């Protein structure tokens, strides 16, 4: 049977749209699914996503679809780009719709909101062992990707053939470089932890602490990420790559990051709910903080930055007090 698309992207937010544009721009027939009929109709009419990614026109070979079953059955290659709290439900919905040779990748950054599990464990629980899985993660702002600015990303899977196929679909010598990484656990973990550290960096800047404090948070945040990774049998080198240090630096230092802007607002005195409302899109780090905190507690891993962000978001702790408590911790070797 001839399939309608080379790859289907599930999720028409800013990031899913940007990835769909990149895939289509590489010459592949790409289908982008969105859950809102009116939003999909507007994108079809405007040939761009004015709601989440304005001024980034769609290539001609990028098609739109609001019917989930049609979207899933249009291709063997599926790329899931939904918020982490919607990931399990999305997989449950599409499971009975999958083609015989379906393979699933995701660019969702986070953990399971109920258990703190890695998304690969969620996927295996829902889908079993038949479907090949892969994850994309790295320092990638949607607007820059969609605009064709140079970008690099990490891609990991336990299926080498799937990695090769996805890499070929995404890689573009002039603007999009894909690095393969065999550390499936580490690549997933980096994308979740960096969101929490970015909130901390934003809080510090919102308070007015300056570049020294921001750099210290990035450095110690990387140490926390690596400690948790080691407890989960990830490779330490992964956290010095695109999915670790790369994504961490990007998200902590640039205001395109919603997590950083969220932290800035908290540091400037806004309440959690108001800060999220003002941003107007999903702030993954809000949920990621609870998920990473749960995972660290389960594995008895010390993560003081994550713990203080958790106290601010979920226990009502004042951001300035949290910062003071971090600074007043006992002296220790690096």
From Swiss-Prot:
Sn-glycerol 3-phosphate binds at residues 109, 138, 140, 194, 247, 257-259. It comes from the Bacteria. Its main location: cytoplasm. It is found in: Cytoplasm. Its EC number is 1.1.1.94. Pathway: Membrane lipid metabolism; glycerophospholipid metabolism. Signal peptide: none annotated. The active site is at 194 (proton acceptor). GO terms for molecular function: glycerol-3-phosphate dehydrogenase [NAD(P)+] activity; NAD binding. NADPH binds at residues 14-15, 35, 109, 142, 258, 282, 284. Belongs to the NAD-dependent glycerol-3-phosphate dehydrogenase family. Catalyzes the reduction of the glycolytic intermediate dihydroxyacetone phosphate (DHAP) to sn-glycerol 3-phosphate (G3P), the key precursor for phospholipid synthesis. This is Glycerol-3-phosphate dehydrogenase [NAD(P)+]. It comes from Colwellia psychrerythraea (strain 34H / ATCC BAA-681). The lineage of its organism: Bacteria, Pseudomonadati, Pseudomonadota, Gammaproteobacteria, Alteromonadales.
